[in-house]
């Protein structure tokens, strides 16, 4: 959808194609309501947000065998995700929901750097 997401997808695919991450795969734009099947941990506001068909994760890296989520990845546009914006509030809501369900969420800013190293470091911890 966005160049920054296309670049991140290519990076994720490249990283998980290595032998040490062969057990992993990635899904793009996964609706949150397909991941959170039982919203009992959520309050009304969180539930409304999570069950909205438009609410999605940019990427979900999961275990190929168990199909269990390993880590979610979000690419945040610099201007769109400014502090105190509506999107920043939704980001915090999504962060909280993912934490409630024990799924790590890694955010990358479009004006950031070191993405490869950060992602590999996190994946190495979860694959051990």
Describe each PLM feature range.
Residues 1-72, 79-128:
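Nucleic-acid endo/exonuclease domains
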């Amino acid at each position: 959808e966005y160049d920054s997401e296309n670049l991140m997808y290519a990076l994720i695919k490249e990283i998980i194609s290595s032998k040490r991450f062969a057990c992993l795969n990635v899904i793009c734009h996964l609706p949150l309501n397909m991941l959170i099947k039982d919203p009992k941990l959520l309050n009304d506001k969180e539930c409304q947000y999570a069950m909205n068909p438009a609410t999605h994760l940019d990427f979900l890296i999961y275990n190929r065998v168990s199909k269990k989520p390993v880590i979610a990845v979000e690419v945040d546009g610099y201007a769109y995700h400014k502090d105190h914006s509506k999107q920043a509030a939704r980001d915090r809501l999504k962060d909280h929901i993912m934490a409630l369900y024990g799924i790590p969420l890694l955010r990358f800013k479009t004006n950031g750097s070191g993405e490869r190293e950060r992602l590999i470091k996190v994946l190495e911890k979860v694959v051990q």
